[in-house]
Amino acid sequence: MIDLTLQRASTSAVPDSAAFRLWAEAALEKPHAEVVIRIVDREESAALNSTYRGKTGPTNVLSFPFVVPEGVPNDLLGDLVICAPVVEREAAEQGKPVEAHWAHMVVHGMLHLQGYDHIEEAEAEIMENREIAILRGLGMENPYREIRPE
């Protein structure tokens, strides 16, 4: 079960909170967790991306895992910050339904909060395979499939 707080700081249309909960729970690998998902605009995403990653411009999803001090019980996984305009643009560019891309970004971010990464090729393969399996369980296509123009 997930205790999800959804913060909407973007004027873009986004899926409802039930969808975010479904996607986050599908990716959850422990019995209970607390997660904050903040939906932001390009400006906030770009500022956070610059501050925490040293990168210019907005990005689709940022993950901020909560590091629990040793010996302290805590269900807080951390925060996800998702840029609505970037998700919408990427879905259009990749020729996929926007809701499927939202689901992918939530699943991707949730896996980061739980220690998955994609810096090394072997880690990326493990993470991507996990994402594909979770999304398949939600009835969605492989987000990494080749998109071929018709």
UniProtKB/Swiss-Prot annotation:
Its main location: cytoplasm. It comes from the Bacteria. GO terms for molecular function: metalloendopeptidase activity; RNA endonuclease activity; zinc ion binding. The keyword Ribosomal protein does not apply. Keywords: Cytoplasm, Endonuclease, Hydrolase, Metal-binding, Nuclease, Ribosome biogenesis, rRNA processing, Zinc. GO terms for cellular component: cytoplasm. GO terms for biological process: rRNA processing. Gene3D superfamilies: Metalloproteases ('zincins'), catalytic domain. Pfam families: YbeY (PF02130). PANTHER family: ENDORIBONUCLEASE YBEY, CHLOROPLASTIC. Single strand-specific metallo-endoribonuclease involved in late-stage 70S ribosome quality control and in maturation of the 3' terminus of the 16S rRNA. NCBIfam families: rRNA maturation RNase YbeY. Belongs to the endoribonuclease YbeY family. This is Endoribonuclease YbeY. The gene is ybeY.
